[in-house]
Amino acid sequence: SPLFKKIFGKSNVGRAYDLPFDIKTRKFSYYNARKQGLPTDSDYVRYIEDWAQVTLIVPPRMDEYIAVNMEIQRIFQNYGSPEDIYPYSIDEGFIDLTSSLNYFIPDKNLSRKDKLDMLSARIQRDIWRQTGIYSTVGMSNANPLLAKLALDNEAKHTPTMRANWSYQDVEEKVWAIPKMTDFWGIGRRMEKRLHALGIFSIK
């Protein structure tokens, strides 16, 4: 979960041995912490151990994940043709609503950005009603890259769990992404290569 990643310093899915605590005893793991360059002062140790006590470690259930993913893909097909739906991972996907937007939201007085937000809210509602899952939506009237950046950098932190980035937002939002690894496609290895080329920011 986003909170789990924030507390334990994880940017993505990891393994039990990557955690700064022992999953059996819930005690701080100095070995893992040092290996990952994490602090080992008493305040941090107490902080990690307090959170470790209330952290649930659950086994993966890939069959169930896949089944729910297929349910969500079928919901997408209510709003776009199969050719406009692009599964990305077990919990992410793209849907191009260009050709169906005016069909679902025909009001000519609304901007395409407003229509996209309204239709995305409808899709969120359908996903929640059918699966019980709260979904987060990144949108763009420009391209999939900006939609993905909107998802990762803004939508996850908004009350509606939606955000729309377009070309006019590049200077204010894209260039303002604080860490290069928060940009889709840039991992730590790529970041090091970019640093070697003298590139230290998205701008």
Give a label for each model feature:
Residues 1-203:
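Gly/Gly-Pro- and Ser/Thr-rich, intrinsically disordered tail segments characteristic of DNA damage-repair
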